[in-house]
Amino acid sequence: MAAFSLDLLAQLPEAYQAFGPLIDILPIIPVFFLLLAFVWQASVGFR
């Protein structure tokens, strides 16, 4: 069982290599929510 889990951990980085650019973008998503809130308030006139 231990050998299987070590083998699985060794394969995961290669399996997720294609998602590298997505992982780089993920931390920026909360900033987009902040900008969305500002644009929404601007569209309703900051009530």
UniProtKB/Swiss-Prot annotation:
Organism: Synechococcus sp. (strain WH7803)
Pfam entry (one): PsbK
Domain of life: Bacteria
Gene name as annotated: psbK
PANTHER family for this protein: PHOTOSYSTEM II REACTION CENTER PROTEIN K, PTHR35325
Assembly: PSII is composed of 1 copy each of membrane proteins PsbA, PsbB, PsbC, PsbD, PsbE, PsbF, PsbH, PsbI, PsbJ, PsbK, PsbL, PsbM, PsbT, PsbX, PsbY, PsbZ, Psb30/Ycf12, peripheral proteins PsbO, CyanoQ (PsbQ), PsbU, PsbV and a large number of cofactors. It forms dimeric complexes.
InterPro entries: PSII_PsbK, PSII_PsbK_sf
Protein name, UniProt field: Photosystem II reaction center protein K
An example Gene Ontology biological process: photosynthesis
Gene Ontology terms: cellular component: photosystem II reaction center; plasma membrane-derived thylakoid membrane
